[in-house]
Amino acid sequence: MTTSIELSSYRDQHYKGSRFEQERSLRDSSTLYVGNLSFYTAEEQIHELFSRCGDVRMIVMGLDKYKKTPCGFCFVEYYKRSEAEAAMRFVNGTRLDDRLIRVDWDAGFIEGRQYGRGKTGGQVRDEYRTDYDAARGGYGKLLTQKIAPNPDNR
């Protein structure tokens, strides 16, 4: 089955299976990865936006693996591939909570993938950020650790 919405070059490095199986899963999937969300965006807001393209089966919010708080991404699964294609076409690059969101194909949600993969528990991209982004927790986590005073040195 070919799709009118092309696959991006991004591939989940933790995918369990061959590259061929991953490509097939992406081409058949009705699950989307949604990135660049504000840490304060609620699941209800995501549902409201994505349900304009079809019946949403499930939304899984991305969580900091240590704090269990939202960390700026989610997975949206539709019942039909055609509904997910509509979301790729019409929602990708739109604004939600005053942020341009990224929508990409996902091979399908697997338990455990809802947790950030960064050293500090969130997303890797938020660890190395040097700019201040209030909607994503302020400065990058590793930068914050470097400039924060060590209470043991007082």
Swiss-Prot record:
Domain RRM: 30-108
Keywords: mRNA processing, mRNA splicing, Nucleus, RNA-binding, RNA-mediated gene silencing
Protein origin, superkingdom: Eukaryota
Residues holding mRNA: 10, 33, 102-106, 113-117, 123-124
Compartments, record wording: Nucleus
Signal peptide: none
Keyword Ribosomal protein recorded: no
GO MF term set: RNA cap binding
GO BP term (any one): mRNA cis splicing, via spliceosome
Xref: PROSITE patterns: RRM
Family (UniProt): Belongs to the RRM NCBP2 family.
Role: Component of the cap-binding complex (CBC), which binds co-transcriptionally to the 5' cap of pre-mRNAs and is involved in various processes such as pre-mRNA splicing and RNA-mediated gene silencing (RNAi). The CBC complex is involved in miRNA-mediated RNA interference via its interaction with Ars2 and is required for primary microRNAs (miRNAs) processing. Also involved in innate immunity via the short interfering RNAs (siRNAs) processing machinery by restricting the viral RNA production.
Subunit structure: Component of the nuclear cap-binding complex (CBC), a heterodimer composed of Cbp80 and Cbp20 that interacts with m7GpppG-capped RNA. Interacts with Ars2.
PANTHER family the UniProt entry points to: 20 KD NUCLEAR CAP BINDING PROTEIN (PTHR18847), NUCLEAR CAP-BINDING PROTEIN SUBUNIT 2 (PTHR18847:SF0)
Protein name: Nuclear cap-binding protein subunit 2-A
Naturally occurring in which organism (per UniProt): Drosophila virilis (Fruit fly)
Organism phylogeny: Eukaryota, Metazoa, Ecdysozoa, Arthropoda, Hexapoda
